[in-house]
From Swiss-Prot:
UniProt main location, coarse: cytoplasm
Organism: Olea europaea (Common olive)
Residues annotated with Phosphothreonine modification: T114
The entry's keywords: Actin-binding, Allergen, Cytoplasm, Cytoskeleton, Disulfide bond, Phosphoprotein
Protein name, per record: Profilin-2
Annotated motif Involved in PIP2 interaction, positions: 84-100
GO cellular component, one term: cytoskeleton
Changes after translation: Phosphorylated by MAP kinases.
This protein's record includes keyword Cytoplasm: yes
Amino acid sequence: MSWQTYVDDHLMCDIEGHEGHRLTAAAIVGQDGSVWAQSATFPQFKPEEMNGIMTDFNEPGHLAPTGLHLGGTKYMVIQGEAGAVIRGKKGSGGITIKKTGQALVFGIYEEPVTPGQCNMVVERLGDYLLEQGL
């Protein structure tokens, strides 16, 4: 299965039990910042934004004072799981990033999708990739 298939079929799919509700954008990005696959709507990000995200995984709390930036959009960092999941909020939407052994799984959402639904979609794929040794 290609990485693009994971994005299309497991991240950009309808939310379970909520037909027509789906993430706004999603991607799988290598920890080196290389894009493995992304939705057409995923923002173009800067290397320093990815560096900040990786630093926060290694030093939890690093992004809290400045916020998480991706594609020029600033998200307020909210409670995640140290070293495993970063969550951010902006207005009626937000972002979830799950770290796997080799990659980062990104999900970006807007209402009517809820933070919990985004977390579920992103973390489910991230956990699967971890189980596969990825």
